[in-house]
Design a protein with these regions (language model features):
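Flexible, gly/pro- and Lys/Arg-enriched active-site loops
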Residues: 53-60, 75-78, 82-176
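Conserved small/polar residues in nucleotide/adenosyl-binding loops
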Residues: 226-227
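Nucleotide and nucleotide-moiety/phosphate-recognizing core
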Residues: 3-13, 19-102, 111-113, 201, ...
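Short polar catalytic/cofactor-binding loops
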Residues: 16-20, 190-194
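N-terminal amphipathic alpha-helix/helix-capping segment at the start of soluble metabolic enzymes
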Residues: 169-190
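Active-site mouth loops of central-metabolism enzymes
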Residues: 191-208
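Structural motif
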Residues: 132-133, 183-187, 195, 220-222
Length: 228
């Protein structure tokens, strides 16, 4: 006798951080979600760096979103999200509302469901329609999804928000590269004996470091290092 397959639901979660290693906290949250036996990551957005809203005297945020499939109920999913926040070090004590946080994992959408049980859980997120820092990552994955209350697509809602002081970024080590701000040039440094262009020239560390410095002085951004 086969067991019934539990029904799965689509949910979109918004993630944000403005303290410490922001990228690490967001990626650790996504990894923790994906390791849950009743959650599967379906898609992820780009990263966006944004100015804080509401409470402005705090560091800039790194924001993103992920789409998941889950057999958890909305409240079970909320418990998972809040446990992940706690495990990664978020504390809400003595922190102003909308203030700094190590990481924030919010349920933005859950199928076409509408939930409102007061302060604990509101779906769709109560301020989704006014937050470009949530809508833009959501539009990377589900631009045509229709808000179940406002009856407008995510892409349409995004056009009604201000995206000033918000940029798509690529985290590179401890830096943030804004997409489209400049053309990036990558240098290729081969430390192999059989490279077509410079085989055997950088087998010793001194020669490799000299060429890497020359690349940096010439304006190269990253250096791709290939070795045996």
């Amino acid at each position: 006798m086969s067991l019934p397959v539990p029904s799965t639901h689509m949910a979109i979660l918004a993630l944000g951080s403005n303290l410490g290693e922001r990228k690490h906290y967001i990626e650790a949250s996504v990894q923790a979600l994906d390791q849950h036996p009743k959650i599967q990551i379906v898609d992820t957005s780009f990263f966006y760096e944004t100015a804080p809203m509401y409470y402005e005297d705090q560091p800039r945020f790194l924001n993103g979103a992920c789409k998941i499939q889950t057999s958890l109920t909305p409240h079970e999913l909320l418990d998972v999200c809040q446990n992940i926040e706690k495990q990664l070090g978020r504390s809400k004590e003595h922190v102003p509302r909308n203030g700094p946080r190590v990481v924030d994992v919010d349920i933005v959408l859950y199928d076409n469901l509408v939930v409102n049980d007061g302060d604990r859980l509101i779906i769709p997120h109560a301020r989704l329609h006014e937050r470009a820092f949530v809508l833009r990552p959501v539009c990377d994955m589900a631009p045509s999804f229709v808000h179940p209350i406002l009856q407008r697509t995510m892409a349409s809602l995004l056009t009604s928000t201000s995206m000033a002081d918000m940029s798509r970024v690529m985290p590179v080590r401890h830096d943030m590269w804004a997409w489209g701000s400049k053309t990036r040039v990558m240098g290729i440094l081969n430390a192999t004996p059989d490279s077509f262009s410079d085989g055997g020239e950088h087998m010793h560390i001194d020669a490799a470091m000299k060429t890497a410095r020359q690349m940096a002085e010439a304006g190269v951004d990253p250096v791709s290092y290939t070795h045996l």
